[in-house]
Amino acid sequence: MTHDLTADRARLAELIRQLAVVHGKVTLSSGKEADYYIDLRRITLHHEAAPLVGRVMLGLLDEAGIEFEAAGGLTMGADPVGTAVMHAAGDRGIDAFVVRKTQKVHGLARQVEGPGVDGRKVVILEDTSTTGGSALTAVEGVRNAGGDIQAVAVIVDRDTGAAEHVAEQAGVPYLYAFSKNDLGLD
């Protein structure tokens, strides 16, 4: 089945505005305060929006010419984004993975769970980013596991320095599907 990426982007933006944007004072995971919160779990776990997330993120990566074999990021925000991309990729053989904040000390003592990333081209995904901290934690974990990071891609960029931090500290392209301005947030 072929999908219209422009229509998918428009519908996903509409769903984000309707379901995920919560106005009011909040403290973000970065410790910064904001006048709104974008709860993208309301999108990435939503029956209609999740497939759109997968197609839009895959389209974003394809348009940028990013080749990869696996996609994932820091648990928990990135978990459903990775599986959405995996499903959208269909028969392309893209795996999903999750990255723990710290390496386990029991079991297999892994920080990266799922199909192995060692020697594979991977993309780090995130739902939203303020400073890039979660993405950078995932980058470090995946690199320690032997993954070859091709890019960091987020659904919504808050335009508060994440792109610069990722470029400077990880040295990989930083892509986003929507800016806060795309969603009418200032």
Residue ranges: model-predicted function:
Residues 57-68, 139-145:
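Phosphate/pyrophosphate-binding loops at sites that engage ATP/ADP/AMP, CoA/4′-phosphopantetheine
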Residues 2-15, 140-186:
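PRPP-dependent phosphoribosyltransferase catalytic core
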